[in-house]
Amino acid sequence: MNQVHIIEAIRTPRGKAKESGGLSDLNPHELLNVLYDDLVNKEILELDLLDEVILGCVTQQGEQAGNIAKSSSLYAGHPDSVSGLTINRFCSSSLDALNIGYLKIASGQHSFVIAGGIEMMSRVPMLSDNAAIWTDPKTALDARIFMMGSGADLIASLNKISREEADLLALSSQQKALKAQESDLFKSIVPVFNKSKNLTCSKDECIRPETTMDGLSKLKPSFEKLGSQGVDALQLKYFPELKEIKHIHTPGNSPAMADAASIIFLSKHKHSSNAQYKSRATIKGVAVVNDDPRLVLSGCKLATSKLLKECNLSVKDIDIFEIHEAFAATIINVQRELEIPEDKLNVNGGVIALGHPMGATGTVMLSSLIDEMERIDVSNGIVATSGAAGAGTAILIERE
């Protein structure tokens, strides 16, 4: 099999998923084009050599419908010969897009692939696709599908994670993210300009510098009402060892909704067609799993554990981890179960503070991981995401 090299990893800032957000004036095609143009303008990418664009996108509705990987490639002026594939594996989508690109190059089918994700939650709201698993109780029950927040509260209840622990995790995420932003550590960000060439967004917008434990403690649980409408009773039936479901998740310790796009340029060569741009990292292993769908967000723990086992490695062998903060309890559980040291885990904050643009999140996290690996001069790292229904993906990368 061919070795697969990451030549470049770039992303837009994460904008607030509101009409007032810094990215909301651009449509998804325009936002992706900012990143495509960056590769071309730097002469990293020679378009005639590009084989395929593969993107993750969760809410494939409206402006994000119609195979946005292919349509955005055409919009950007890529050759007609460039294939396009859009996938939805919930919040693991962009890492799974990357995995598909990795496999196509490793197998010899392709030489150059752009893989990543897009989600414009300000313009295409979460759940606006009206999928039956979210809107029809019978379908959800038959498929054993729960909303993400309900799953997070279940994980907290099963693992005896307190509200205070969740709030402390959220506060730490905010503090680390703010420090990283003020220290200009997010080097992978490509500033976004509008059609009039005015700067609209150059940094992640979701960080809340004013966050305190006192403020977090005053927020009301977000999913208690949903629980009282029958979800709690169903979860207690499935997990009889529990006496109650503890609703510890609030807007303060849950991931912030965001707009963003991210792309990773993959190659079978150690450099792009322009030899100036050499491989930043290689992909050394991938694990794709699905856990019990009733647990909803346990996939990143299982995927990380599987990846380590398959690569014959332990947590001690990994220099740094970027793990999806899919609600506070999920990341607390990952850290506890896998015994990841604090100084190796999400060292520059996570999506609770920085924002969670669903279909783009995994490769946004990967770009930040590579930035940090280069900054502190370490050799390897793992990025992992959870998705709904127990989905999980983890990827091991190694610097050249």
Across the structure, where does each feature detected by a protein language model lie?
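Conserved catalytic cysteine-centered active-site region
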Residues: L26, T59-H110, A143-S150, S217-A256, ...
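Glycine-rich loop/linker segments at domain edges
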Residues: T12, K16-E19, Y102-N159, S228
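Short, well-ordered amphipathic alpha-helical segments that serve as non-catalytic structural scaffolds
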Residues: P28-I44, I68-S72, A97, M148-I155, ...
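N-terminal amphipathic/basic leader segments beginning at the initiator methionine
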Residues: M1-A17
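N-terminal extracellular/periplasmic Venus flytrap/periplasmic-binding protein-like
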Residues: I10-P13, S24-D25, E30-V34, L168-H269, ...
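Conserved beta-ketoacyl condensing-enzyme motif
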Residues: L23-S92, A97-F112, I118-W134, V192-K203, ...
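Active-site-proximal alpha-helical scaffold in enzymes
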Residues: I87-I118, A156-F186, I263-K270, R336, ...
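Glycine- and Gly-Pro-enriched alpha-helical subdomains that act as flexible
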Residues: H269-D317, Q335
